[in-house]
Amino acid sequence: MSVADTIARPYAQAIFEIAIENNTIEKWKNILIFIKTIASHKKFKNFLSGSISPKYLSLIFITIGTNIIDENAKNLIKLLSENQRFNILNNIFERFVKLEACYKNIIIVQLKSAFSLKENHINKIRKVLERFFLKKTKIIYKVDPNILNGMIVKVNNTIFDLSAQNHLKQLSDSLNF
């Protein structure tokens, strides 16, 4: 786990607890997307370098997002500004999404294949994973031409490498002792 992930964890946890308490998970997801979109804008990055005061920086965010930002979001923006933590917004968002998935009993699966899979193949993979993990499954699918053939499935910290490249490596390792 990276340092940014470690720092982001308590922020995401606090935001998620507020979202659960107020039944506003989707709203908070949109707020986090909004804040990280503004913070990552190339014209806005100059402000994040510390050249302006945290109070003024907070005011800019709050002014831009008047229609989406409530009191709790204002407090988050002020806290991120005072602690100079806008650089970990992606980590906070990713952690928030993982907390939501866990709360809704969903696992997030990253699936990579050497070539494009049809939707019915992805659905078959989803069904197998749902039976295996006994949870609903959300698949994030990408084509990776670097994989010779087959696929790689990543669930949390577990990787199922079903690629030809991995099979060749295992064969090579077994022949080389």
UniProtKB/Swiss-Prot annotation:
Per the UniProt record, the source organism is Buchnera aphidicola subsp. Acyrthosiphon pisum (strain Tuc7)
Cite the source lineage.
Bacteria, Pseudomonadati, Pseudomonadota, Gammaproteobacteria, Enterobacterales
What SUPFAM superfamilies does its record include?
N-terminal domain of the delta subunit of the F1F0-ATP synthase (SSF47928)
Q: Does the keyword Cell membrane apply?
A: yes
Question: What Pfam families does this protein map onto?
Answer: OSCP
What function does the entry list? F(1)F(0) ATP synthase produces ATP from ADP in the presence of a proton or sodium gradient. F-type ATPases consist of two structural domains, F(1) containing the extramembraneous catalytic core and F(0) containing the membrane proton channel, linked together by a central stalk and a peripheral stalk. During catalysis, ATP synthesis in the catalytic domain of F(1) is coupled via a rotary mechanism of the central stalk subunits to proton translocation.
Q: Which UniProt keywords apply?
A: ATP synthesis, Cell membrane, CF(1), Hydrogen ion transport, Ion transport, Membrane, Transport
Q: Which InterPro entries match?
A: ATP_synth_OSCP/delta_N_sf, ATPase_OSCP/dsu
Protein name per Swiss-Prot or TrEMBL: ATP synthase subunit delta
The record's GO CC annotations read:
plasma membrane; proton-transporting ATP synthase complex
Q: Which GO terms describe its molecular function?
A: proton-transporting ATP synthase activity, rotational mechanism
Give compartment(s): Cell membrane
Query: What does the sequence similarity comment in the record state about its family?
Result: Belongs to the ATPase delta chain family.
Assembly with partners or alone: F-type ATPases have 2 components, F(1) - the catalytic core - and F(0) - the membrane proton channel. F(1) has five subunits: alpha(3), beta(3), gamma(1), delta(1), epsilon(1). F(0) has three main subunits: a(1), b(2) and c(10-14). The alpha and beta chains form an alternating ring which encloses part of the gamma chain. F(1) is attached to F(0) by a central stalk formed by the gamma and epsilon chains, while a peripheral stalk is formed by the delta and b chains.
Annotated membrane topology is: Peripheral membrane protein
Classify the source by domain of life.
Bacteria
